[in-house]
Amino acid sequence: MAPNLRKSHPLLKMINNSLIDLPTPPNISAWWNFGSLLGICLMTQILTGLLLAMHYTADTTLAFSSVAHTCRNVQYGWLIRNLHANGASFFFICIYLHIGRGFYYGSYLYKETWNTGVILLLTLMATAFVGYVLPWGQMSFWGATVITNLFSAIPYIGQTLVEWAWGGFSVDNPTLTRFFALHFLLPFMIAGLTLVHLTFLHESGSNNPLGIVSNCDKIPFHPYFTLKDILGFTLMLLPLTTLALFSPNLLGDPENFTPANPLVTPPHIKPEWYFLFAYAILRSIPNKLGGVLALAASVLILFLAPFLHKAKQRTMTFRPLSQLLFWILVANLFILTWVGSQPVEHPFIIIGQLASFTYFTILLILFPIIGALENKMLNY
């Protein structure tokens, strides 16, 4: 009998072992769909991004009008742009839900997979930030100015670092061209890191809602989870296309319809919604360096998750106190997101400070304490 090409060919064998004959826990819920959804997001963003890059001009005098030209004169240019801009929002929705799932079900105990995932999040944030600068509207320009300026808080080398990043003494043409180069490069870096992420995941196999070893029960990925993933794709692409076609500017800032002007500061400088929680934490500390450190810590704290796990059970499925704390954390993140979009005035300042304090307290102090407490309760 001739050998099965799918199982013998060096390249097809790898694809087969990753997507077809992969042993998968039978009880993984819809929360395990977000990994593949992120893959679809990445592919969609790279495709629409390539098509947009073909019509974009990375020059301060032409960038804004080249984007307008794409929307007006290129066949379906408006659709490509709207899908790309809103696709970024869906990318972040999926990654935040994916991280939340990992946190709830203790997936961070696969340390390598978790750490590469956090690096992926940081790369995605960098990509989204440099991408937001490219249309060269008011919020693009001032967002770039404010965020790059944060590096000047680094003692001794800060100012030099900022001028080196800018390619001059302010955000100008060199900044725009290098941001375009970075925005083109980073998604391919994300794709490469994704393969590393998957390699580490397939070393251990997937976690499951019970957090127990499921080797004896595993089923093949295809057809069960390929079909489940296709359902996930349709359920994500439907709201994405709806948003892109019916209200494409819902999540954008109206300021960005005004071309960048270094002489006029917008009354309200704020990032896109997916950065607002971190922006609120940054603003809650009146000291520049302190704010920058808190901003960095708000995301880098994820690296500590495996070390803060004190419970005997892996997942929160049977840990009601941890569940309560988890949902308080989620609510707290919503509050931070809302505060980040508000002006810096009373009562938003104090709300932001309390929410930021709560965020770090829950993650660093309360989760380990509750985990240890639940261990004690198991003995009674």
Curated annotation (Swiss-Prot):
Subunit organization: The cytochrome bc1 complex contains 11 subunits: 3 respiratory subunits (MT-CYB, CYC1 and UQCRFS1), 2 core proteins (UQCRC1 and UQCRC2) and 6 low-molecular weight proteins (UQCRH/QCR6, UQCRB/QCR7, UQCRQ/QCR8, UQCR10/QCR9, UQCR11/QCR10 and a cleavage product of UQCRFS1). This cytochrome bc1 complex then forms a dimer.
Keyword vocabulary terms for this entry: Electron transport, Heme, Iron, Membrane, Metal-binding, Mitochondrion, Mitochondrion inner membrane, Respiratory chain, Transmembrane, Transmembrane helix, Transport, Ubiquinone
Lineage: Eukaryota, Metazoa, Chordata, Craniata, Vertebrata
Keyword rRNA-binding in record: no
Family, similarity comment: Belongs to the cytochrome b family.
Binding-site positions, heme b b562: H84, H183
Transmembrane segments: 34-54, 78-99, 114-134, 179-199, 227-247, 289-309, 321-341, 348-368
Molecular-function annotations in GO: metal ion binding; ubiquinol-cytochrome-c reductase activity
GO cellular component: mitochondrial inner membrane; respiratory chain complex III
Binding-site list for heme b b566: H98, H197
PANTHER family per UniProt: CYTOCHROME B
Free-text comment on the cofactor: Binds 2 heme b groups non-covalently.
The protein, known as: Cytochrome b
Localization (cell): Mitochondrion inner membrane
Miscellaneous comment text of the record: Heme 1 (or BL or b562) is low-potential and absorbs at about 562 nm, and heme 2 (or BH or b566) is high-potential and absorbs at about 566 nm.
InterPro entries on file: Cyt_b/b6_C, Cyt_b/b6_C_sf, Cyt_b/b6_N, Cytb/b6-like_sf, Cytochrome_b, Cytochrome_b_C_euk/bac, Cytochrome_b_N_euk/bac, Di-haem_cyt_TM
Cofactor(s) listed: heme b
Membrane topology: Multi-pass membrane protein
